[in-house]
């Protein structure tokens, strides 16, 4: 009998048989299943209350990659957890117990667990090899070619599927102390390949390369069985983790050797209280020398890179220098310019004309300027001039985000502008393997807007896919926040001194949105002499609680007048007090979209979504991009009992989401300023509170203000606003892209004169 009085938190070696599936997600292999057992250790509260004739206990198990077949017994290790659905076993490790009888082998092989083997093939295999079947699969799989219907291609599928299953089980066993999920084990397998178990046995610190395995976590567990504090493997793991931490958190492509040694020592010695036992700087320096010698770290001057990041920067600099070295045929633009003036009915300023000319005189050019300085007009002129010069030519418009690309298409009057990921064939991910085939962009002219959002990795992918004879025009505002990813590509290109740059600095917007453009210019210059009026408003509020309350009132009023889709709250923080975006989202939703019925809402963990909610996609998919905004239009229940959520992201992008897909959706009445990069809204509301001062720099405020097309409302304490305006962001990202471009240009013996980085036209 199971002991109902005993406290149950975990169980190991629990033998069960699969009974039924409650839920299964094909995308991530997460499943909720009912299993049966006669194990007396099962807690009473976990057992099904129904009576079964076989007198076996039924309970619910949840986990990843759980076999859903009655052909094998399972041995489960896990923890008992209480959820809103009841007491469940959260499976941490499992293994199949395959019966050695002919019937057992037949059931196992024919269960579909091994790709390439169906019921008929399973019969033939067991009939041929009998009790030696599993030994054949383990050690001599090529003998399966004797079986009719198993080709070389099918054998490869069988080997890969069986090997992956076996490696994952071994990996789960090896990494048991880390309490990883099978999904994480799969991630490790995909990163290191079939040899992952051997690799991690030899050097467990390689786990630090996997997201979620920080050095401290890995080190704490490794030292329980291997307390060699001064081992080269431990020091190497700390070095690589320190470089990656600097890249992901601070945007640095490298660390100076002195800083790397210092930060690595802090990491290594944090758990060592006795000074005499601590790792010395000389030991880290010696390990670094060996890592450099073997290519595990790249040294450039006194700067140290991970090989992958060094390759991104160096490869990009080389491609840019090659593009600049290719003497581009300058085109006679004057007649085309005259045609543009007539067709568009516009008069271009000297700077704007110079920007158009430069685009057709060089293979790579940059146009910069703050809002209201006429960048869109210049883009229209370049497109029209290109059509005039090349009636059969092809051009492509791109931007880093879906919203920015759609805005680019709307403002220029072009049918289509695409995200960089889509145009470059990068799919929805953020990494591309070295062996992957490169797809070149088929265009004679490529224009990219919002290029300041492009990080080092994406810049490399972009230039790799643009032909050397394609003219490239990069457009952006270098005074905005740098890219979310590592590097400072746009700034480095501008200040390399090698790329022709036209700066548009005359504000043309003189009417209803004039104050926004002028005040953005003043903020960028560090001036607090801002003009206030109907389109640029400051609402004084001394405390964060009061600020949050006033923002809610203002939002409701503005949304009623302009529509929810045209009003956006932009906060410096996602989670920090009442004026952070998460807290504002919950408060505002209760006012503009309160609870109506259980049928019109769905709960995912601690989050709730309702019909009519304003939402944001937070991960790229084939249909929608990270940062896209939309509305929930309906919530239904399918035949399996799953709640399905209907979304409308505009145009033909009407999609249905499963509960798992909602993990990549947030409420979006309020968002962070970083998330709004590349977007524009009619009205923007910005909290300015003391609690956010750690983030309030000039470029953050400037970025928030320039998201507004018609109205900016600042709510908070004016001294905090002035502090932000005066506070230049002094944090510099470590990158040598500009210097590397100059060195490559020199190496290619560029014949033309080096153009000044900030070319003043006119």
Predicted regions: what is each one?
Residues 345-361:
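N-terminal pre-P-loop "Q-motif" helix
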Residues 361-367:
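Pre-Walker A (Motif I) flank of P-loop NTPase domains
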Residues 366, 377, 381, 385, ...:
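Conserved helicase motor core of SF1/SF2 NTP-dependent helicases
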Residues 374:
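Conserved glycine(s) of the Walker
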Residues 628-762:
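C-terminal accessory regions
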